[in-house]
Amino acid sequence: MYNIKRVNLLGKRFYEVDGFGVFPSVTTVLSTTGDKSGIERWKKRVGQDEAERIAREATDRGSVMHKHLEIYLGQDLKQDKQSLLKSSKEQAVADTEINSFNNKAKDLGEDLFMKFYNNDNFFPSIESTIFQEKFLWFNKSNLGYAGTVDNFSLLKDGSRKVIDFKTAKKPKQDNWIMDYKLQVSAYSIAIWQRHGIKPDGGEIWIANEIDDVPQKFVLSFEEIRFFFELFMQRLKRFEEIKREAEAAGVNI
């Protein structure tokens, strides 16, 4: 068991892994190196206070949905779906993390979870959960990163896949989710390095507030390798930004 500590450096989230080093989180790498022009235009249009409120609500609903998914998929999935739902709802009612949110976030997060439950393209494809909410890190040639993967499961077709859960206000187009693909790829390769298990691919599940049917984007292992190389380019750029900030004595 490794001693892991979350630390704040240069205004960003890093993880200190005892004996290995200090690594930026995957989300820190992506948020720092991504194109922020669209977000900045949106903030200017709606105002800073409104932007913060919307972002906070999105984070809260996502946290609630993630917890419902974690509870549901942490059960013996060989049970019938009605029994699984009954048990998971009983656990959710008593869950301290879910109960820390306001009723609006709890209701919306549960509604988004139920969209996955009500569509047979999602839970029925999973044979069993290998692990979920697992801390991972990767390091090679003085480059490294860390983060927590949502879910890694054995599917009924025999494949093992990283599954990442997302929420959205409206449906996503494939060309809008590049960072999601990079994130799944980073976690997949970290699983391979840390646990010696080569994932067969990845999936991105997105529940949005408009459609009853969530979206599923599927990545092959060949695509994961491709996107991992792109992620490593972003990681190298992040390290350049970090060095510049350290030299200037400012936050990233």
What positions do the PLM features span?
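Generic preference for flexible, low-structure residues
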Residues: 81, 85, 215-218, 247, ...
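Short, surface-exposed, charged/polar-biased interaction segments
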Residues: 28-30, 208, 252
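Mg2+/Mn2+-dependent nuclease catalytic core
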Residues: 130-244
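DEDD superfamily 3′-5′ metal-dependent exonuclease/proofreading module
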Residues: 2, 100, 155, 240-252
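Metal-dependent nuclease catalytic cores that hydrolyze phosphodiester bonds in DNA/RNA
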Residues: 1-146
